[in-house]
A protein has these predicted regions:
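SAM-dependent transferase fold signal centered on methyltransferase-like domains
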Residues: 1-366
Length: 366
């Protein structure tokens, strides 16, 4: 770790790298400067990133600390949990906070880093080839190979279909996957599916399997501080309608989980025309699941019509939100300036046409 100490706080210039290399070795110097670069990038995921070790690829897939704590919270306190894919230890650290863990990581470098980061031993063998002597397990199949993101689940390591089959005999097993995978594929793995959002993005799909899994489909929102909110996706959507006094952009996990019916029922909202993810209603609604806007104008997506609406408001478009395909063809919307009042342009589909709302965020000025 001498190289890390020597490289700390120094920009990775040729002179600095050469200076550190003279004290250790060129390989150790390059490794140390890479670690400090990765530690800086990892700060968004891990509060204690400055003490951790990373590989570039493993950091990309590593679970942020707030989400890892949610994963760990699903397992009983004090029960043994197997981390089948420890990586550099993102989930392993959170699992260890709540009880005993057995960790598997077949990649030697990642296993060493996981041990450093979590302070626990990691078995170097393949978890899928081991005899399972636990009732709880978590798996985050690798979705990258040689720096390339894999899109086909059968290429993941381990194969999530095989993991789900093995987990069916447990009390509870969790599999972390991409939220971009199809509903049909996810349903084939298990009956309890969660779509998780963090910092405004839907970041993962979680499949829970076993006798303690709660069947259903859910949206889960994890705040930066770790607070957790859940929506049940069992409620149906009400009838669609045109724009009312307010429009709301729903959290992406609620959209992906098909859980907008719960938000409509709670706040008296309706889907906006033919959009997926925009809701509308006559009253303002306060919810961590919704970002609200006061509708000022509703115009067809033609430049003359939108500019005329903006002129009546003496407004300029400061932000563009869109849930229509091929948004780039409406690039002119961002250049609409007909005054100083800052508004948000919301593009949405209605039947075969596209319309533009000019609206003000309800949280503007806070």
């Amino acid at each position: 770790m001498e190289a890390l100490a020597l490289a700390q706080g120094k920009p990775p210039t040729a002179a600095n790298i050469r200076s550190v290399a003279e004290a250790v070795s060129p390989e150790d110097a390059a490794w140390a400067f890479t670690q400090w670069e990765l530690r800086e990038r990892a700060r968004a995921k891990f509060p204690d990133a400055e003490r951790m070790l990373f590989t570039r690829e493993a950091l990309e897939q590593a679970t942020p600390a707030a989400i890892a704590r949610y994963h760990a919270s699903m397992f009983p306190h004090g029960a043994l949990v197997a981390d089948l894919t420890a990586g550099i230890g993102g989930d392993l650290m959170a699992l260890a906070e709540r009880g005993p863990v057995v960790a598997f990581e077949s990649d030697e470098e990642r296993a060493v880093y996981a041990e450093w980061n979590a302070g626990l031993p990691a078995r170097r063998d393949d978890a899928m080839a081991a005899e399972w002597q636990w009732e709880y397990a978590f798996c985050d199949p690798s979705r990258r190979r040689a720096g390339r993101r894999l899109s086909e689940p059968e290429d993941f390591s381990p194969n999530p279909v095989e993991v789900a089959r093995r987990m069916s005999g447990l009390r509870l097993g969790g599999i972390k996957l991409s939220p971009m995978l199809s509903d049909a594929f996810l349903r084939n793995l298990g009956d309890s599916i969660e779509f998780v959002s963090h910092r405004g993005e839907c970041v993962e799909a979680l499949i829970w399997i076993g006798t303690e899994a709660k069947p259903g489909r859910y949206a889960v929102q994890i705040a930066a501080g770790g607070a957790v909110s859940r929506l049940d996706a069992s409620q149906t959507l009400p009838a669609r309608r045109d724009a009312a006094a307010f429009v709301f952009d729903a959290d992406p996990s609620a959209v992906r989980a098909h859980a907008l019916g719960a938000l409509c029922a709670e706040h008296g909202l309706h889907p906006l025309a033919d959009s997926v993810g925009y809701l509308t209603g006559e009253q303002a609604a306060a919810s961590p699941w919704l970002r609200g806007y006061r509708v000022l104008a509703d115009a067809p997506a033609r430049e003359r019509a939108v500019r005329e609406a903006a002129r009546r408001l003496a407004a300029r478009v400061a932000e563009v939100k869109s849930r229509v395909p091929d948004t780039q063809r409406f690039g002119w919307v961002a250049r609409v300036v007909e005054g100083e009042r800052r508004v948000t342009a919301v593009l949405y589909p209605r039947e075969r046409s596209v319309r533009v709302l000019l609206a003000e965020p309800l949280d503007a000025g806070r």
